[in-house]
Amino acid sequence: MQTLIENVNIITPGEDIKTHQNVLIEDNLIKTITHDKISNDCMVIDGEDNYLLPGFIDCHTHIFAKGFHKEENMANPLGIHFYNAVPHSKQTINAGVTTIRDCGSADLSFKLAQQRKLFIAPKIHLSITPLVMTGGHFDLLLPSGWDMEIMYPGFPKGRCDGVEEVLKKTREVKRAGADFIKV
């Protein structure tokens, strides 16, 4: 399937705005950008007075989170968070964000489902769970003694102290599918 965006202004980082360009898209990939007329039998979008720019990258998101409500997180199985994240992912794409770095909430199954195009979502880079020191940000051991850290299969606990524990926890998080380590 081909789509042609005619007469659009293109913003590319580090370059001047290119005006009145024609962009041919084939199978969701840009095939041609030219000032010349393109005659193809395809869907045509009039881009006059509009701008086309590269997708944004959200470097810090929690795609599964709808705020941090410990009670809700504890009451729901992981699948509920997954299904809540699907429409959030589509909203993210519709806002022009084509890549996200999830800094602790999404698991490997979500990334694999996105890669298999089971739903509309940006490209996902996972941290699985952040590494935290005892008493630090995201250490959910409460003064009452209750540990509010949510445990799901595929989510190693993030609490670690000292070099040896951090190295071991890093290996566990990488094994769970992390693309990067959040500390």
Q: Which stretches of residues belong to each language-model region?
A:
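N-terminal metal-binding scaffold of metallo-dependent hydrolase/deaminase domains
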Residues: 1-39, 50-52
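Hydrophobic/aromatic beta-strand patches that form the interior of the parallel beta-sheet core
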Residues: 5, 43-45, 125
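Divalent metal-coordination and catalytic microenvironments
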Residues: 8, 23, 28, 49, ...
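Extracytoplasmic/periplasmic beta-strand context in beta-sandwich domains
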Residues: 21-22, 43, 122
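Short, hydrophobic beta-strand segments that form beta-sheet elements in well-ordered domains
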Residues: 30-34, 44, 100-102
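Short acidic/histidine-rich motifs immediately flanking catalytic phosphotransfer sites
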Residues: 40-42, 178
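Metal-associated gating/positioning segment near the N- to mid-region
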Residues: 50-116, 135-140
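Metal-coordinating catalytic core of metallo-dependent amide/deamination hydrolases
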Residues: 118-183
